[in-house]
Amino acid sequence: MLDIATFSVEFTEKALGHLESFRGFERNIILDAIKAQLPHQSSQETRHRKLLRVNPLADWELRVQAFRVFYEVDPENYVVRIIAIGHKQHNTLFIGGEEMQL
């Protein structure tokens, strides 16, 4: 029998602020994707999750349509920590209304 641990998902204060900046239906899309994608095997690359190269923001990215969820995984404590949430317009990433470079 295969036992797959379930990770709890935590949001930083900044990430909660980023989430609040989106419209209600956008928040629902983002939260539904987080619930579906991150509690199980959150550190396994998939079509929507990827390990990022070294950057000051986070280790992992979850792509949800034009939205990006940046997170870190703590495998010892079974925690996924959401660091930032933004959206992409063409090749430009915006987090908290500011353009970001990764």
Predicted ranges, named:
Residues 19-23, 61-63, 72-74:
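Short histidine-centered beta-strand/loop micro-motifs
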Residues 1-6, 28, 64-68, 72-102:
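Enriched for short, Lys/Arg-rich terminal
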Residues 17, 36, 40, 87-90:
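Active-site micro-motifs of SAM-dependent methyltransferase domains
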Residues 36-61:
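A short, surface-exposed loop/turn module that caps and links secondary-structure elements
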Residues 13, 55, 86:
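Residues at the C-termini of beta-strands that transition into short coil/loop
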Residues 1-33:
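Arg/Lys-rich, positively charged N-terminal/basic patches that mediate binding to nucleic acids
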